[in-house]
Amino acid sequence: MPQLLLVRHGQAGATTANYNELSPLGHTQSARLGEWLAAHRREFTAVYVGGLRRQRETLAGIADAYARAGLALPSGEELPELDEFRFVELVRAFANAQPDHPDLLRWQAAPDDRGHWPTLLRSTLHAWAAGTVTEVGEDYAAFRARIARARERLQWQLEIGPVLAVSSAGVISHFLQDVLGLSTDATIDINLGYANTGLSEYRLTRAGLKLAQWNALPHLSAPQDRELVTLV
């Protein structure tokens, strides 16, 4: 039964200036994931990745591990539909729409404090989905349509064989929304709880895609690895 492995990128930089590149920990997470996949001889007939640097660097860490193990991994094909929503652009639009929102004010007081990011993202995504954040290049409906295109492309590729795709939490959570018919509120909650380099696995059946596992971290499951698990 053909399987799709969806992977979130590793931890990104700690500031808005370098969030599009992996942190040192993010590189470690990516390498560990690649080592686990290689050790379990996971083979893929196609590999896809979004165009964001943090996504491409994550795939590079996986590919390096395969190379060290002497295993073949198809070259990653860029699939723009796997790009994350533009967080900085969304926050800027949210600030224009709701300049006195408490989550925004807390973040503005300490913009590089990762602890403020989840609550700000939650409020921003709810406003975006509700249509009250409009000064953005991609509205929520367009984002949802893009995820649907990604799902169709990956499902088509699964007809040939197993697929690996590296993306981001927003894309992966909304992909799940499409498969399971989740509410927007539930999808946003899932988005915020998705771990860096977390794995989600789908199987292609006659009835379509079926979820097999969600947000798994088999490569970071040892007790001594707890400090390697991150959400932001």
Regions found by a protein language model. Give the residues of each.
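Acidic, low-complexity terminal tails and accessory targeting/binding regions
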Residues: 1-2, 85-112, 141, 156-162, ...
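Conserved beta-strand termini and adjacent loop/short-helix elements that scaffold enzyme active sites
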Residues: 7, 79-81, 214
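Active-site metal-binding loops of divalent metal-dependent hydrolases
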Residues: 10, 169, 215-217
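Phosphate-coordination/substrate-recognition cap region in phosphate-metabolizing enzymes
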Residues: 35-119
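A mid-sequence, solvent-exposed acidic-amphipathic segment
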Residues: 134-163
